[in-house]
Amino acid sequence: GVIRCLSDRDGWSAKWYDRMKKPVLEAPEALQSIEEASEHLPDADELCLQSDPVATLQKGGRLAGLELLSNFLHERGEGYSKEMSSPVTAFDSCSRLSAHLAFGTVSMREVSLACERRRQQIKEMPRGMKGKWPSAMRSFSGRLRWHCHFLQKLEDEPRIEFENMHPDYDGLRENVFNDLFFEA
């Protein structure tokens, strides 16, 4: 997604499409490791932390990311466009790829290309077999672009991390900000 040192945003969308259409690079056969001693990292018990009651933690790693992607594109994702916004249905209907994209275990290009391949497969299905898949893949593809659009906006205008994007919002709520609510 992000293109560094753009002089302006004109043509960003076309550049994004061009980048996403390129083939995924092959992984290197080996990486040179760094020989460095590491200090002991304490575990939860040593830090006197309670065990985490969350039973549905996602598995990390590349294989888990690829499995989630495939499962979303072929099973869970059919209701995506209608179910992504509800806390009741989103867990099962969304891709759950955010952590994998953030940590780089899958790339935006991989996800985009896989989505496009799935869109083509769906297009070739008989009409009665398509279900809600065309809408789901269109919505998901749009969200991928939207994600990259806003990352690009942050790259081009880093001030928006701390300032309002539009100056008309300056002063709108500063006088009613409550530190206690924010910290909660």
Task: Explain the meaning of each model-derived region.
Residues G142-R143, H147-A184:
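Aromatic-anchored, charged helix-turn/loop surface patch used as a conserved interaction hotspot
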